C-alpha cells in the first residue's frame, strides 16, 4: 500500500492523522531496525553454531530475482528466497500437480554472495539443514546454484519446466516462425517428451536443428544453455518423487512481496530504503508481523540504551583526560592566577574596622548611633505632647 493510501486508511479506521512524510520516515525506520534484527541473528548463528530445528520431510527452496526502479531512472535486481513444505501430489486438470504450503520469504538488494549469507537466518529457522529432502527449483542462473551450494549442497536441483520450455520454443520460432501451426505442433510434441520421457530425445532433436540451420546462431546459444543443465531436467523422475517442477512459488513471491509494493506506478526508491521495505514486506507476507513488531521495539529500545551508554563513556573519558592533563602541569602553573593584574594581599595585622583594633579575636559589636544622631530626635514612636509640670504654689 502506498504511503498516501496508508495515511488515509489510518485516518479513516483509527481517526489518527499523520503526514505522509512522517509515515514514510517511521516505516523506513522500522524496516531498518528489522534488518538489524536479522543481521544480528546471522552473526549469532555464525558465532554459536546452534543446532538447526527439525525441517520438513520434503522442503521447497527456490530463489529468483526481480527488477525494481531506483531514483534517477536506474533499475536494480532484488533477490528473493522462498521456502515451503512440499505437499502430496494432487490430480488437477488431467495431470498430477504438486503444491507447497507454509511459504516464507526473504528478499534483499545485494550481491549474490552477500545474499547467501544474509539468508542464513531464514534457512536456519526453517530447518533447511535438517530437512529429509530439499528440492531446489530455479531458472538455472549461476548465482542461484552458488546459493544452493552454500545452504544445502545435496539438494535436488530442478530447472523450472516453463523456463526450459521457453528455450525450446525460441528455437522452434527461429526456424518456423512465431505462432505458426508447424511451430505449435512441433513444440507440443517436444514438451510432452521432455516432461514424460526426459531431455535425451529432445536435445537430439535440437542438435539436428542447429546442424540444419547454421545461419541461425541463436539456436546454438539456446542449445548450449539446455545442454549445460541436462542433469536438472529429469522431469519424469521428479514427478515420480512427488517433486514440483515449476518455480511458481518464487515467481509469485516476486510479484506479491516485491513488485506489488516497490514497482507501482510512479515509484522510485532510494537504494538505502529498499532493504528496509523488503524486510517489512517479508515479515508481513510470511505471517510474522506480530513477532517482527516485538523484535523491532526491543531492538530500538536497546539502541537507545547503547547510545546513552556510549555518551556516558565518552563523557567520562573526556573528564578523565582533562583531569590527567591538569595533574601533569607543574605546580607553579597551577598556582598562578589567570589575570596578570596583581591582587593586593592584606596583612594579617591589618584590620579594616578600627573598632576591632583591640585584637583579631574580639567579637564585633553591633553598631549603635550616637546620642546626638538625628534618629535619636525623630518623633516617630514618641508622644507628640507632654503634660507640663507646674511648680507648687507658695501659699500651700
Residue ranges and their predicted role:
Residues 1-396:
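Catalytic center-proximal scaffold of phosphoryl-transfer enzymes
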Amino acid at each position: 500500500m502506498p504511503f498516501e493510501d496508508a495515511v488515509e486508511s489510518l485516518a479513516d479506521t483509527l481517526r489518527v492523522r499523520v503526514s505522509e512524510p512522517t509515515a514514510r520516515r517511521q516505516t523506513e525506520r522500522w524496516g531498518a531496525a528489522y534488518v538489524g534484527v536479522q543481521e544480528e541473528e546471522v552473526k549469532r548463528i555464525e558465532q554459536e553454531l546452534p543446532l538447526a530445528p527439525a525441517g520438513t520431510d520434503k522442503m521447497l527452496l527456490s530463489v529468483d530475482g526481480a527488477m525494481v526502479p531506483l531514483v534517477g531512472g536506474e533499475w536494480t535486481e532484488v533477490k528473493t528466497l522462498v521456502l515451503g513444505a512440499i505437499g502430496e501430489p494432487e490430480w488437477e486438470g488431467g495431470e498430477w500437480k504438486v503444491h507447497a504450503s507454509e511459504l516464507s520469504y526473504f528478499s534483499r538488494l545485494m550481491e549474490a554472495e552477500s545474499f547467501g549469507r544474509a539468508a542464513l537466518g531464514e534457512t536456519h529457522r526453517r530447518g533447511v539443514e535438517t530437512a529429509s529432502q530439499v528440492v531446489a527449483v530455479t531458472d538455472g542462473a549461476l548465482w542461484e546454484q552458488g546459493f544452493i551450494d552454500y545452504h544445502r549442497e545435496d539438494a535436488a536441483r530442478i530447472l523450472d519446466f516453463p523456463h526450459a520450455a521457453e528455450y525450446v520454443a525460441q528455437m522452434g520460432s527461429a526456424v518456423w516462425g512465431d505462432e505458426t501451426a508447424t511451430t505449435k505442433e512441433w513444440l507440443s510434441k517436444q514438451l510432452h517428451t521432455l516432461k514424460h520421457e526426459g531431455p535425451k530425445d529432445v536435445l537430439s532433436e535440437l542438435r539436428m536443428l542447429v546442424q540444419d540451420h547454421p545461419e541461425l546462431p541463436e539456436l546454438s546459444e539456446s542449445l548450449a544453455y539446455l545442454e549445460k543443465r541436462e542433469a536438472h531436467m529429469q522431469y519424469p523422475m521428479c514427478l515420480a518423487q512427488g517433486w514440483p517442477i515449476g518455480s511458481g512459488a518464487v515467481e509469485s513471491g516476486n510479484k506479491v512481496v516485491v513488485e506489488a509494493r516497490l514497482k507501482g506506478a510512479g515509484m522510485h526508491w532510494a537504494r538505502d530504503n529498499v532493504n528496509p521495505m523488503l524486510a517489512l514486506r517479508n515479515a508481513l507476507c510470511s505471517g510474522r508481523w506480530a513477532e517482527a513488531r516485538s523484535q523491532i521495539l526491543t531492538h530500538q529500545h536497546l539502541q537507545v540504551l547503547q547510545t546513552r551508554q556510549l555518551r556516558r563513556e565518552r563523557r567520562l573519558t573526556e573528564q578523565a583526560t582533562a583531569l590527567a592533563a591538569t595533574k601533569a602541569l607543574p605546580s607553579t602553573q597551577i598556582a598562578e592566577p589567570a589575570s596578570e593584574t596583581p591582587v593586593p594581599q592584606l596583612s594579617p595585622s591589618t584590620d579594616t574596622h578600627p573598632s576591632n583594633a583591640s585584637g583579631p579575636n574580639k567579637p564585633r559589636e553591633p553598631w549603635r548611633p550616637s546620642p546626638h544622631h538625628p534618629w535619636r530626635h525623630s518623633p516617630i514612636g514618641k508622644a507628640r505632647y507632654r503634660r507640663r509640670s507646674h511648680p507648687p504654689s507658695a501659699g500651700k
